[in-house]
Design a protein with these regions (language model features):
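Terminal intrinsically disordered, low-complexity extensions flanking WD-repeat/beta-propeller proteins
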Residues: 2-20, 29-31, 272, 278-358, ...
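Conserved strand-to-loop turn within each blade of WD40 beta-propeller repeats
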Residues: 37-38, 88-91, 136-139, 187-190, ...
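WD40-repeat beta-propellers
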Residues: 43-47, 94-98, 142-146, 193-197, ...
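Canonical WD40 repeat/beta-propeller blade segments in eukaryotic WD-repeat proteins
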Residues: 15-26, 65-78, 113-127, 164-176, ...
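Short C-terminal beta-strands that terminate individual repeats in beta-propeller domains
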Residues: 9-13, 55-66, 106-116, 156-162, ...
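Beta-propeller domains
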Residues: 1-2, 29-63, 100-101
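Short coil/turn segments that connect the beta-strands within blades of beta-propeller domains
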Residues: 30-32, 82-84, 130-131, 181-182, ...
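Short loop/turn segments immediately following beta-strands, especially the blade-tip
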Residues: 47-52, 99-105, 146-152, 197-200, ...
């Protein structure tokens, strides 16, 4: 169970962008950084554990060619082996800062030469993989930047061509020294997922076709892709093969954010945030899904949600036209939550899961289980 905590005020409301919240925890200093996009600026806040704001900074998108001010599309902290960089994307280019936003160390201007007169030019989708930072583009390409241990000598090392429509999000997980491991996934507006192996030269391993709706947010968990779609579904795929494990009708409207820490958080425009436990069956290795918590944010078009700590004991939410960051924290330890809540599980070979907030009819026979509808495949 989670309870509402003290909110963190914003100078301006959050823009209606998917994944419009980034969180960086600094355990040594007992601080948490939050980043939110508002039009042509990004707001950076530092807060104590009780939610008291301690410092604020506002970053502007770097001006480029054009008459209108550039709009920011995303802000995200990238944790690299030897440093942390803050990456800001806009309709003009890609800006990289030191983690506190005090010094810009790199600027990459977007080349609109390949864009048609009616096509918007922007960068969107940011993730770190080893000493690389990957950034998605409106053209479907993914730029890979090689980041040095210190200093501004950042190099564009590669451009990945796997998508034909704008990139929406990128997710990574540590390869941990394994060869031929799928450790990067990119998503686009058509719902297509591209799975890559990182390295000096990135390699495309597989493509997972879309089905007519965008995929605004993706995550990677132990070689499994969690993908959130515009129809409210969360789908779990085997990263190396593209095999579908589980399909969850998690929300009634488009999903806007996913996060892992280590449970899966899903947030959508239906005002709900859900938390799911993912595990593998010890008997057959099947993916199992267990609903842990659902939180309604009334009268709010949720646009961003993130866990605030690695254990997943707290999370934060942003909403369109909402001038504050909402905070929620667990009132029970993880062990107490497991003992005190009824739960249900499903093996991917057998079932499709429907959340109680996803009000859709199903032509398949159903049965009720702890207020959730489980449809048999």
């Amino acid at each position: 169970m989670f309870r509402r905590e003290r909110s963190i005020p914003l100078r301006g409301s959050a823009a209606a962008l998917c994944n419009n919240l980034s969180v960086l925890q600094l355990p040594v200093r007992n601080l948490t950084h939050f980043g939110v996009v508002h039009g042509p600026s990004a707001q950076l806040l530092s807060a104590a554990p009780e939610g008291v704001p301690l410092a604020q900074r506002q970053l502007q998108a770097k001006e480029g060619a054009g008459v209108s001010p550039p709009l920011i599309t995303q802000v995200h902290w990238c944790v690299l082996p030897f440093r942390v960089l803050l990456v800001l994307t806009s309709h003009r280019g890609i800006q990289m800062y030191e983690s506190d936003g005090s010094v810009m160390v790199y600027w990459h201007a977007l080349d609109a030469g390949d864009a048609s007169l009616v096509q918007a030019v922007f960068a969107r989708g940011i993730a770190a993989s080893g000493h690389f930072i990957c950034v998605g583009m409106w053209s479907g390409r993914v730029l890979v930047f090689d980041i040095p241990a210190k200093g501004p000598n950042i190099v564009l090392s590669e451009e990945l061509a796997g998508h034909q429509t704008p990139v929406t999000d990128i997710a990574t997980e540590p390869a941990e020294g394994q060869d031929c491991v799928a450790d990067v996934v990119t998503a686009d507006d058509s719902g297509l997922l591209c799975v890559w192996r990182s390295g000096p030269k990135f390699k495309l391993l597989t493509r997972i076709p879309g089905f007519g709706v965008p995929c605004p947010s993706v995550q990677l968990w132990q070689g499994t892709i969690a993908a959130g779609y515009g129809n409210g579904q969360v789908r779990l795929y085997e990263a190396s093969t593209g095999t579908l494990h589980v399909q969850i009708d998690a929300h009634a409207r488009a999903i806007c954010a996913l996060d892992l820490a280590p449970e899966l958080l899903s947030a959508a425009e239906d005002t709900f945030v859900h938390i799911w436990k993912l595990s593998r069956s010890p008997e057959g290795g099947y993916i199992e899904v267990e609903h842990r918590h659902g939180e309604c944010v009334p009268d709010t078009q949720v646009c961003g949600a993130r866990f605030c700590d690695p254990s997943g004991s707290s999370f934060a939410v942003t909403g369109y036209d909402l001038a504050e960051i909402l905070r929620f924290s667990s009132i029970l330890s993880p062990g107490q939550q497991r003992k005190g809540r009824p739960s249900w599980r499903t093996c991917y070979k057998q079932r499709r899961i429907q959340s109680p907030t996803a009000h859709r009819s199903s032509p398949l026979p159903t049965r009720s289980c702890c207020q959730h509808t489980v449809s048999h495949w």
